């Protein structure tokens, strides 16, 4: 019997890879093969000169059931017995949905040749690069983009590309296939998530993707840029020199900025910034340049122990203001490392292995602390007497002579900088390991490339050095070499060697294809067994593979002028252009496309992981990114990841603080501490505290208090304050002499942030150098800036080329820079500034005018222009402020014109100002889960989203509701919950009797089945599968010993045949047949036939005549319902073998039907959960069960099937239940069950747990198969919106589930949503509206708080005004509060005075513990003040200045909140606001509807009477809307205006108001016009007004009294009897009668 088993094993193993004798056959492939990519492989025969045909196959792994590629090649002596066939693996033939790594089997067969290698698969078949027109956008703007697609040969790819847009929250909002020749822009919505967005591009049906980023912010472009250049890239703690930062400020049109910079240094420790307050300095910016200095003494005074800062970073925060104070740019230089040694040494470019007795090239990479290359730094390895100096890329090569017998080599390298002491030099050590020769042969190969800067066009010398015994060297006839580039085998060649040559040199021509780097791998063979190899990594200078240049005239251009640029590039190239305002790059230049970024991305496709060489011959191939196998069983390790572990990133070559002090007084104190107590007095106390009260805060002792009081009283007697005020004289002048007429000035109005988004093809005939050129003509836009023209070309054969940016400088000698905020609030007064620049070398006199726009209230009116005239000095600028109040929501023009007297210089600018509603934007979020199967009625779910109740909405503002629907794909639960690496114990060699052998065979069968299905072989080892298959083959052959002639089985052949064991053999063999070739269908189907003919009863049940000896192998059969169990178990075996035996067993279908009918009768009466689960699986597998109610009723907690004290049986039974539900497609029930199974951490045993082991892993494998393929998501959703006649319909399926669908409506009405179908989705309803600001009065608990502000005079550089903010608080408890926070929200346009806050936190009489300023430019500034305590007995007061940096009127209040750090419920909030009565434009508002009120008041018409015809003529002018006789009922006051409430007594001329007599009317006038009007209560008046003075609101019309309003007192009836009024009354009567009866004359 044993001989028969051995024979069968040998027969089955035929066809598995075997060794050939007499020659060495080699197969080399890339270690990672890419789909849809032509890959070159190498097959070589050494020691064989017989021509032969080789078949090359690529199969799927692990089962090799599918041939993915095949070809045939001829190997012959003429070709050196070396062939390099090209293979290509179609992506559509392999799984792209798997979460696990995918592998393929590369197989070479031929006469005497059989080679096979499992190789990792990658889906990165090509590259996608995304270019956007800019890196930052505002809400509502379009995102323009291009996608460039190329393969690894840099050739154009024409595959379908999908482009997706994702919000900062990761929500997919757009997904479309794109035409690579034309791209539609993506339009950002107005209501959009701010932050960093992603554009993801990927090929259709490919998991690989490429991402580009852009920011969405509310921003305005700066007018100048600031660049900072530190004197060193590090701060050396032991140095003696101060640290300097050079500041360069340039306007974006190229001219230098004159102004001032405020510089503050600090240290960033982890994520916390700790400033150095004493470093705050004011630096003049002269001719655009300035220099800030951090003195070491200042640094040490803040951080006495600099050693504690090593490893942290220094930063410099710089704020630059222009001379006029009109503009400000804030920037920061960070990442300046604080170091004990200024350099770092890396060995990332150094091979870790050496060859004893041969030179070792040690490449040292030296960087600055920020990671940038450190050039010109001497380095030395003293032990080897080798030294060198780094090149510009930071590298230096040291040649080390290695002893002959060295096995390891400790190497220490240090910098040798002359200015550093030895202990501060950078030092780095490594240990290199000797290359291990194969079998200790002592044969070596050393490949040396000594050139440093390598570029295309060079001829590179490559040296092959050999060392070994004489006999071996005689056998070397040639070297085989491979050149790898971008992860592919680029070239294969041979270099001959003559006898006696220890050094062979070849020249390698460097072509552009080898950019950005390549690997040179070489090897030779010794005999027919040994391979000796070496490799080296070579960097190539980054350039375009082709050519692209943008040329222009390099002249300064005028805005709007015509100009030309010339494109020069490769013939046939397609060039994409864009011109970007340089100001955009000041805000964000992170995402700009560049050639370096392209090469950095491409270089990541190099699958090599070291700088060259290797631990041994196999290590050389592995580290270079190659897979090798030979006929002598030399095999590289299995690669399990496409990417290498990443070492250190390779850097491609790529308020003024003014301190008043009285030094003489302080000098009286010799003691340094007491002197400081005196000096701290000199700082003015913002609170105005007396000297005695200030002394209470001193904690340094009585001596300090005494010194403080003495100095304080002295200073109080001598201090004086000088205040100066500066005014800007603005005049109105109607003099036109010498100025260009405004109508002749054409305003500039086109100010895009980017433009020239064009694509041009270079189709022109090339010149003698092979360069094609194209000249483009265009008109510049109106911006005065520098346009950066970016050009990116794509050539089918030379890939992508990014040209050097070409800059177009645009300016005028005299121009306006109109600076406006991103948006302003309706009815909120704001100042805009026009900066007039004079670049003429002489003084000029200028007139500037703000043009009238009815959408604004301003000094310019319809009838009177607002002009100012003033001089501007030569080569200087002047800021002119204009105050406006926007009255209407939307985009409105602001236009300024200016001209120079007696000159032809003029300019005009018209820009759009965005006006947003009042209030604060709020959102209400509602989330609805759509699950029609669970929540619907009759399969349809109906949801009605009720209209919102928005009681706090600002009247007449829009409501916007967004409905976002996103599918919920069914999640995979199992993932890697079952760790495949823990199945090692199941791969065993079967042995023993017929039962024991099957127990042991089932283990590798189920392990292989599970690991195949879940693709987890790499966790156990790819090579272990061959071992497992061999064990299965062994078990199969062993079981044949126990097979009887009738195909039944028993533990021994002399025992009676077992029904259960025979069914078990059928089941396990049927499963094994899926994984192992050679398992005969006769063997499987013979067992099926025996079971049907010999063991099935007439009623369909199966019986057992000979129970197995090993009862535990049967699992849960023990107990009641054994006949049902056996029938169900055998039925499962029949069903699982049906695909094999259906054509060979005629009675199989009828047998299955009989067994099924038997089980159906028993199923609902079963008592045991175990039997119920097994029977349910058998019936479901036979397609006879689709109702899960009985099955689920037998469960415990609906997630497992439990019987008392039977854990492994419970696992087995639960596994049957899971299989049953999967067969019934009840996928929604499976999740909890899978979780229960995986939570058991059950990895099985071979004895006592056989069935539980087999069934658990079979069920989990089936779940892995079923869940990704069923993709049970097919939802139809209908949305009925109030403003749409046609409902909106969406269909959500598995492929588009993650795409967020958004629909919007502006009507606040009910929305109806219906969903039907299968699956789930999430519906998010977002309602946005503007809510009225509400001050919650007296929001106080445990704190008293009083806040006030007062105007102060201050002459601060850059500040437009100042307020003193006074905060007084007291704790209302019985004792003082402990740590307390004061959170201050600043007024819009104001910043805190840093000097005041510093004084409050410093000095011996410090009032606050510390403070923080949150200066987020997109929001209001916040100041956080920390107090150690707040008194419960007296007020604690803080006074500090807040400085106005830009004008905002009608601003919203600021707030002050005080609260306990330890009890957030103890808090108090108060609001503060500057005086509203000063400097505000006149406007009249009813609710939120406002009108601009003119400067001139109307007055009561009574001085001179006009005759009736003239009066009728005036009343009938076209602009007059109404004529009434009214009675004044009362006078009210509102918001600083007078409200005259009148009753209409008579309608003389009908106006807009259809029924004016129905109710009283409000006539509104400015308070200042009260005296001029002099209206009296109960008097009657004739009144008319123009249509433009009506103020309609939702339910009424109010009337504004302006200079256009006619008001005349109408005498009472008794007064008309008097002679004085008779004529007037007659005229009024005639006037009224004429208009009433006859109307206005036509």
UniProtKB/Swiss-Prot annotation:
Q: Could you name the domain of life of the organism this protein comes from?
A: Eukaryota
Region (C3a-like domain) residue spans? 654-732
Keyword Glycoprotein assigned to the entry: answer is: yes
Provide the free-text tissue specificity comment from this protein's UniProt record. Answer: Expressed by the venom gland.
Signal peptide positions on this chain: 1-22
Q: How does it assemble?
A: Heterotrimer of alpha, beta and gamma chains; disulfide-linked. Is active with factor B in the presence of factor D.
Q: What does this protein do?
A: Complement-activating protein in cobra venom. It is a structural and functional analog of complement component C3b, the activated form of C3. It binds factor B (CFB), which is subsequently cleaved by factor D (CFD) to form the bimolecular complex CVF/Bb. CVF/Bb is a C3/C5 convertase that cleaves both complement components C3 and C5. Structurally, it resembles the C3b degradation product C3c, which is not able to form a C3/C5 convertase. Unlike C3b/Bb, CVF/Bb is a stable complex and completely resistant to the actions of complement regulatory factors H (CFH) and I (CFI).
Q: What is this protein called?
A: Cobra venom factor
Question: Which species does the entry assign this protein to?
Answer: Naja kaouthia
């Amino acid at each position: 019997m044993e001989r028969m088993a051995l024979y069968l094993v040998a027969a089955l193993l035929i066809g598995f890879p075997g060794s050939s004798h007499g020659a060495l056959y080699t197969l080399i492939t890339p270690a990672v093969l890419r789909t849809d990519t032509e890959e070159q492989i190498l097959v070589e025969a050494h020691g064989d000169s017989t021509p032969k045909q080789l078949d090359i196959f690529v199969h799927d792994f692990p089962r090799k059931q599918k041939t993915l590629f095949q070809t045939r090649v001829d190997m012959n002596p003429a070709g050196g017995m070396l062939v390099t066939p090209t293979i290509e693996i179609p992506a559509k033939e392999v799984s792209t949905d798997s979460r696990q790594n995918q592998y393929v089997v590369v197989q070479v067969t031929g006469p005497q040749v059989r080679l096979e290698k499992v190789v990792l698969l990658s889906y990165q078949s090509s590259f996608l690069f995304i270019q956007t027109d800019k890196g930052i956008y505002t809400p509502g703007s379009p995102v323009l983009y291009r996608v460039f697609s190329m393969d690894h040969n840099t050739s154009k790819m024409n595959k379908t590309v999908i482009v997706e847009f994702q919000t900062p929250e990761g929500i997919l909002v757009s997904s479309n296939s794109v035409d690579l020749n034309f791209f539609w822009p993506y339009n950002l919505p107005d209501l959009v998530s701010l932050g960093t967005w992603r554009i993801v591009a990927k090929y259709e049906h490919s998991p690989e993707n490429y991402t580009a980023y852009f920011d969405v912010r509310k921003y305005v472009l700066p007018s100048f840029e600031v660049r900072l250049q530190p004197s060193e890239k590090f701060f050396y703690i032991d140095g003696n020199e101060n640290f300097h930062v050079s500041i360069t400020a340039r306007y974006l049109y190229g001219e230098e900025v004159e102004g001032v910079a405020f510089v503050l240094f600090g240290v960033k420790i982890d994520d916390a910034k700790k400033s150095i307050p004493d470093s705050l300095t004011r630096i003049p910016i002269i001719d655009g340049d300035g220099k800030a200095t951090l003195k070491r003494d200042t640094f040490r005074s803040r951080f006495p122990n600099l050693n504690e800062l090593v490893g942290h970073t220094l930063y410099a925060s710089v704020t630059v203001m222009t001379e006029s104070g009109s503009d400000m740019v804030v920037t920061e230089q960070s990442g300046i490392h604080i170091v004990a040694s200024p350099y770092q040494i890396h060995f990332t470019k150094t091979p870790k292995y050496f060859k004893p007795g041969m030179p070792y090239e040690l490449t040292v990479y030296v960087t600055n602390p920020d990671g940038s290359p450190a050039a010109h730094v001497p380095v030395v390895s003293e032990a080897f007497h080798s030294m060198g100096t780094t090149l510009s890329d930071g590298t230096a090569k040291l040649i080390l002579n290695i002893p002959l017998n060295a096995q390891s080599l400790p190497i220490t390298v240090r910098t040798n900088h002359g200015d550093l002491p030895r202990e501060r030099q950078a030092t780095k050590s490594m240990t290199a390991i000797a290359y291990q020769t194969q079998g200790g042969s002592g044969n070596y190969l050393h490949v040396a490339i000594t050139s440093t800067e390598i570029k295309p066009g060079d001829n590179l010398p490559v040296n092959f050095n050999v060392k070994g015994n004489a006999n071996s060297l005689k056998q070397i006839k040639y070297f085989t070499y491979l050149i790898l580039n971008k992860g592919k085998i680029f070239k294969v060649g041979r270099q001959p060697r003559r006898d006696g040559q220890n050094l062979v040199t070849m020249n390698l021509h460097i072509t552009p294809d080898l950019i950005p780097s390549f690997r040179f791998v070489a090897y030779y063979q010794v005999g027919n067994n040994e391979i000796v190899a070496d490799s080296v990594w070579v960097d190539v200078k980054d350039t375009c593979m082709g050519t692209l240049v943008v040329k222009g005239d390099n002249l300064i251009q005028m805005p709007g002028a015509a100009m030309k640029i010339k494109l020069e590039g490769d013939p046939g190239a397609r060039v994409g252009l864009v011109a970007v305002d340089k100001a955009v790059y000041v805000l964000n230049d992170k995402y700009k496309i560049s050639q370096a970024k392209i090469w950095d991305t491409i270089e990541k496709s190099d699958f090599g992981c070291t700088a060259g060489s290797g631990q041994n011959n196999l290590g050389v191939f592995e580290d270079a990114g190659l897979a090798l196998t030979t006929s002598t069983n030399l095999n590289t390790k299995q690669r399990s990841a496409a990417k290498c572990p990443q070492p250190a990133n390779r850097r491609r070559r790529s308020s003024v603080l003014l301190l008043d002090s009285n030094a003489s007084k302080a000098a009286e104190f010799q003691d340094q501490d007491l002197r400081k107590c005196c000096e701290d007095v000199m700082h003015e106390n913002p609170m105005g505290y007396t000297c005695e009260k200030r002394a209470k805060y001193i904690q340094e002792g009585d001596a300090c208090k005494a010194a403080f009081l003495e100095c304080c009283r002295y200073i109080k007697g001598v201090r004086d304050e000088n205040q100066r005020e500066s005014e800007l004289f603005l005049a109105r002048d109607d003099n036109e002499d010498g100025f260009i007429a405004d109508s002749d000035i054409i305003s500039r109005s086109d100010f895009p942030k980017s433009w020239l988004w064009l694509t041009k093809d270079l189709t022109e005939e090339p010149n003698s150098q092979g360069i094609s050129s194209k000249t483009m003509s265009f008109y510049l836009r109106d911006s005065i800036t520098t346009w950066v023209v970016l050009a990116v070309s794509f050539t089918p054969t030379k890939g992508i080329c990014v040209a050097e940016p070409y800059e177009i400088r645009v300016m005028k000698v005299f121009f306006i820079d109109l600076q406006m905020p991103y948006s302003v609030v309706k009815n909120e007064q704001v100042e805009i500034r026009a900066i007039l620049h004079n670049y003429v070398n002489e003084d000029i006199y200028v007139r500037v005018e703000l043009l009238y726009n009815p959408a604004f209230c301003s000094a310019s009116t319809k009838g009177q222009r607002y002009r100012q005239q003033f001089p501007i000095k030569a080569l200087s600028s002047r800021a002119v402020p204009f105050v406006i109040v926007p009255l209407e929501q939307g985009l409105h023009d602001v236009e300024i014109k200016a001209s120079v007297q007696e000159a032809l210089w003029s300019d005009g600018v018209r820009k759009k100002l965005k006006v947003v509603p009042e209030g604060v934007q709020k959102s209400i979020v509602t989330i609805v889960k759509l699950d029609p199967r669970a929540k619907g009625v009759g399969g349809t779910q109906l949801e009605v989203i009720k209209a919102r109740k928005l009681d706090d909405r600002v009247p007449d503002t829009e409501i916007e509701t967004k409905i976002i629907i996103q599918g919920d794909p069914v999640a995979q639960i199992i993932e890697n919950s079952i760790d495949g690496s823990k199945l090692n114990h199941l791969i065993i060699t079967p042995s023993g009797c017929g039962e024991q052998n099957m127990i042991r065979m089932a283990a590798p069968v189920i392990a292989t089945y599970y690991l195949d299905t879940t693709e987890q072989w790499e966790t156990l080892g790819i090579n272990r599968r061959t071992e497992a298959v061999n064990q299965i083959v062994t078990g199969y052959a062993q079981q044949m010993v126990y097979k009887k002639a009738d195909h039944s089985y028993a533990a021994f052949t002399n025992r009676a045949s077992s029904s259960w064991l025979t069914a078990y053999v059928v089941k396990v063999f049927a499963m094994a047949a899926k994984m192992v070739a050679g398992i005969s269908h006769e063997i499987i189907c013979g067992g099926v036939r025996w079971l049907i003919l010999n063991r099935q009863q007439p009623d369909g049940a199966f019986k057992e005549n000979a129970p197995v000896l090993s009862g535990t192998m049967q699992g849960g059969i023990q107990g009641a319902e054994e006949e049902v169990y056996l029938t169900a178990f055998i039925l499962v075996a029949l069903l699982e073998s049906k695909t094999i035996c259906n054509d060979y067993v005629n009675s199989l279908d009828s047998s299955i039907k009989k067994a099924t009918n038997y089980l159906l009768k028993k199923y609902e009466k079963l008592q045991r959960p175990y039997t119920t689960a097994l029977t349910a699986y058998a019936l479901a597998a036979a397609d006879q069960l689709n109702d899960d109610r009985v099955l689920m009723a037998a469960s415990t907690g609906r997630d497992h099937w439990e019987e008392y004290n039977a854990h492994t049986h419970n696992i087995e039974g639960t596994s049957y239940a899971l299989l049953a539900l999967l067969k019934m497609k009840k996928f929604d029930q499976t999740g909890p069950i899978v979780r229960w199974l995986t939570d058991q951490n059950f990895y099985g045993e071979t004895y006592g747990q056989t069935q539980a082991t087999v069934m658990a892993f079979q069920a989990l494998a089936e779940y892995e198969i079923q869940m990704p393929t069923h993709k049970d998501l097919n939802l139809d959703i209908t949305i009925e919106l109030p403003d749409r006649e046609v409902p909106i319909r969406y269909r959500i399926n598995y492929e588009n589930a993650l795409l967020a669908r958004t629909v919007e409506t502006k009507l606040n009405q009910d929305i109806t949503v219906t969903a039907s179908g299968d699956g789930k989705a999430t519906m998010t309803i977002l309602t946005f509206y503007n809510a009225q600001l509400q001050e919650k009065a007296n929001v106080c608990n445990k704190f008293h708080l009083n806040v006030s502000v007062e105007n102060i005079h201050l002459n601060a550089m850059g500040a437009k005004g100042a307020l003193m903010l006074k905060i007084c608080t007291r704790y209302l408890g019985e004792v003082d509060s402990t740590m307390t926070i004061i959170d201050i929200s600043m007024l819009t346009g104001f910043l805190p005075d840093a000097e005041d806050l510093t004084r409050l936190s410093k000095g011996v009489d410090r009032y606050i513990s510390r403070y923080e300023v949150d200066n987020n430019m997109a929001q209001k500034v916040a100041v956080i003040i920390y107090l150690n305590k707040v008194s419960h007995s007296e007020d604690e007061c803080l006074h500090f200045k807040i400085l106005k940096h830009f004008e905002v009127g009608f601003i919203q209040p600021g707030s002050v909140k005080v609260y306990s750090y330890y009890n957030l419920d103890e808090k108090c909030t108060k609001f503060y606001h500057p005086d509203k009565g000063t400097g505000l434009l006149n406007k009249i508002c009813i609710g939120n509807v406002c009108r601009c009120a003119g400067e001139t008041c109307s007055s009561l018409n009574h001085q001179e009477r006009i005759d009736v015809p003239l009066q009728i003529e005036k009343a009938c002018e076209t602009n007059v809307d109404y004529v009434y006789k009214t009675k004044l009922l009362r006078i009210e006051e509102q918001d600083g205006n007078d409200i005259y409430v009148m009753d209409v007594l008579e309608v003389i001329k009908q106006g807009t108001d259809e029924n004016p007599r129905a109710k009283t009317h409000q006539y509104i006038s400015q308070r200042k016009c009260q005296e001029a009007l002099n209206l009296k209560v109960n008097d009657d008046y004739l009144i008319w007004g123009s249509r433009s003075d009506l103020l309609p609101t939702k339910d009424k019309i109010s009337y504004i009294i302006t200079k256009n309003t006619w008001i005349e007192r109408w005498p009472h009836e008794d007064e008309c009897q008097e002679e004085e009024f008779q004529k007037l009354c007659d005229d009024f009567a005639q006037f009224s009668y004429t208009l009433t009866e006859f109307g206005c004359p036509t």
